[in-house]
Amino acid sequence: NLYQFKNMIQCTVPS
């Protein structure tokens, strides 16, 4: 679940 959460944030916040 944590992996998915991090992935969602990365998709929302393109570094």
Swiss-Prot record:
GO terms for molecular function: metal ion binding; phospholipase A2 activity. Expressed by the venom gland. It catalyses: a 1,2-diacyl-sn-glycero-3-phosphocholine + H2O = a 1-acyl-sn-glycero-3-phosphocholine + a fatty acid + H(+). Its EC number is 3.1.1.4. Belongs to the phospholipase A2 family. Group I subfamily. PLA2 catalyzes the calcium-dependent hydrolysis of the 2-acyl groups in 3-sn-phosphoglycerides. This is Phospholipase A2 3.
